[in-house]
Amino acid sequence: MAPHWAVWLLAARLWGLGIGAEVWWNLVPRKTVSSGELATVVRRFSQTGIQDFLTLTLTEPTGLLYVGAREALFAFSMEALELQGAISWEAPVEKKTECIQKGKNNQTECFNFIRFLQPYNASHLYVCGTYAFQPKCTYVNMLTFTLEHGEFEDGKGKCPYDPAKGHAGLLVDGELYSATLNNFLGTEPIILRNMGPHHSMKTEYLAFWLNEPHFVGSAYVPESVGSFTGDDDKVYFFFRERAVESDCYAEQVVARVARVCKGDMGGARTLQRKWTTFLKARLACSAPNWQLYFNQLQAMHTLQDTSWHNTTFFGVFQAQWGDMYLSAICEYQLEEIQRVFEGPYKEYHEEAQKWDRYTDPVPSPRPGSCINNWHRRHGYTSSLELPDNILNFVKKHPLMEEQVGPRWSRPLLVKKGTNFTHLVADRVTGLDGATYTVLFIGTGDGWLLKAVSLGPWVHLIEELQLFDQEPMRSLVLSQSKKLLFAGSRSQLVQLPVADCMKYRSCADCVLARDPYCAWSVNTSRCVAVGGHSGSLLIQHVMTSDTSGICNLRGSKKVRPTPKNITVVAGTDLVLPCHLSSNLAHARWTFGGRDLPAEQPGSFLYDARLQALVVMAAQPRHAGAYHCFSEEQGARLAAEGYLVAVVAGPSVTLEARAPLENLGLVWLAVVALGAVCLVLLLLVLSLRRRLREELEKGAKATERTLVYPLELPKEPTSPPFRPCPEPDEKLWDPVGYYYSDGSLKIVPGHARCQPGGGPPSPPPGIPGQPLPSPTRLHLGGGRNSNANGYVRLQLGGEDRGGLGHPLPELADELRRKLQQRQPLPDSNPEESSV
């Protein structure tokens, strides 16, 4: 999330310059359509175990869509998205094992990802996959939709090893032009031409030719058609790379456009089987006055026209401004790219160790140019006949001095907090006869933005949620069917370019400014322009103020049925108003009169909730409330309420539409009741157990110091002798008597019998442990506590404890024990039972 200071600082700069930044900066889509609302419009395909719908190819004549995914190929009918065929093309287990042994990931990398899929001729497709980091290519029979038998071709230079790396390619007259990374490590970039009648051609492996590029797109432009100079067709490649010419930022990444000529044959001695027409220039997507620069090129779309002169390119860019992430769309004209490639070159100066403009005379024929009529008149019919000095110049000067600037000298659209990933464009003729360009932009969180280009600015028609938090991985448009196809990691989606039926009123249809839609006066519906007569349709794409347009045509106004609401006096009443557009504002009426935006102590409009709050409703607040969605001078009825106020206790209510899923509410109530019952039973059980424990404790207390020990009568034991331990420690008598004269005896500290054998059972002495094979545990007996202490009453008349007087023995015990000291680890408990 960008800090507030960054957003406000940038907004202040835009406002201060006052150059109309509101027409391209962070525009708000007029409508937001969730995936649930698209359920009746879109078609979806997914299959267990199939992932990464990366490559989409349309064949308009056959009406088929070919899809390349991870280790699978599919053929669909475009209109119904019905599966026509499927091919499983998995990398063998041994290839995957080798991939894992080389340190690659067995979950995301060691598979066969389809990266190239295009028609080779009328009967076959040419397909290439990463094949677990050992790229392979083969042919697909379009009639049977099966892989051709035989050995797979080596895909090196045609397809990347790594599925995450950029790739661009296209087939032109049976020849494959590809831009990829040519080795396992991804350190050797290459722009390659192979297959077809000519021998293969590739770029020089030099940093100032290609420096860590990430390829995003390619385009074929037939510039020889209708050329007065006899020019050649060209193939353009779009990528981003680390700039070698930057003085201050050695690690700066810039966007590039490069081009080669279709008829390039390489040089005879210099640049043998290397491009002699390879030139590149920087693509600028910036607004210098706003200090916005976009260099991270993500995707490029080529919009062809009936004439190649009108070819337009749309680039998708990303940038970071402070902690704020931005995305932008820039438009480029082919003639601007041609102008830059005909301009001055850059040159590296060894002395200054930097790149600068080449100022010396340019040799003739012009280095890097295609073979044209001028070359033929001067005896150069092929690049093989070009002089070495021309080829050496091209080899050292592939970079142009000037950069290709965007149309309108700034981006068409900039959005903050959004990552644009893909773009396709379409040209549409409106009812006014003008041609409009409609852009469809995919995002990193699964949304599709639809915008119409209106000269130097755009209007965001809507945003559609195609996927749930999944990046859009591919996007194509069928010009003939007017259908869009988008792929993500888990599914494929088909949807029409426009859903005109969702506009329910004339004003809503016209305010959408969608070139595909118009309001039909005869049917009172918003319909697609293509299938209706223009004389009965209303459409205004360029007009921003549509007030009165629908009224003049006599269109019917649709008013929603009011909801009856009864509230208690003193209640804060919330009346929601669902606006038809994100660009609209709510206007409320009460009793037919307009309500102010805020009336302290009575009415308050909450923009966050999009609701009118009636504070402490009183009988004077009863009546009819109507909410209108007001946009560009047009008023659309949105909600209506009939409120009645009755006397009673004060509670807070919110007006809501009738619950559609009442069964779910009752189910939740029953579940909550069951949980409460279980908790109640648990509390009662714990309470019963606690009562039992307390009763046991009370009974034990009543038995304290009441019953003497009944010990068996045995013969008198011999007199006690101390144990023959030299380190015996005497006990301190202090702490072994109670305040009432009672003696504490610790079991286990008795005197030892002479001889080494087990002692004979002693006679019954009050307080002495009972005889046992080892030692008697007194913890559970009466007159003893948990530590086994026995309390002896040595004073008074009952000192004998067994009914016969033992004064001599008692005195002897008291005298002996007073001479002993407590053991170091002893800590006898003072309590007794």
Curated annotation (Swiss-Prot):
Domain of life: Eukaryota
Topological type in the membrane: Single-pass type I membrane protein
Extracellular side of membrane: 21-663
Membrane-traversing stretches: 664-684
Disulphide-bridged cysteine pairs: 99-110, 128-137, 261-370, 285-330, 500-517, 509-526
Alphabetized UniProt keyword annotations: Cell membrane, Cytoplasmic vesicle, Developmental protein, Differentiation, Disulfide bond, Glycoprotein, Immunoglobulin domain, Membrane, Neurogenesis, Phosphoprotein, Postsynaptic cell membrane, Signal, Synapse, Transmembrane, Transmembrane helix
Stretches assigned to the Sema domain: 30-497
Database matches in SUPFAM superfamilies: Immunoglobulin, Plexin repeat, Sema domain
PROSITE patterns in alphabetical order: IG_LIKE, SEMA
Similarity section: Belongs to the semaphorin family.
Function as written in the Swiss-Prot or TrEMBL entry: Cell surface receptor for PLXNB2 that plays an important role in cell-cell signaling. PLXNB2 binding promotes downstream activation of RHOA and phosphorylation of ERBB2 at 'Tyr-1248'. Required for normal brain development, axon guidance and cell migration. Probable signaling receptor which may play a role in myogenic differentiation through activation of the stress-activated MAPK cascade.
Protein's name in the database: Semaphorin-4C
Recorded name of the encoding gene: SEMA4C
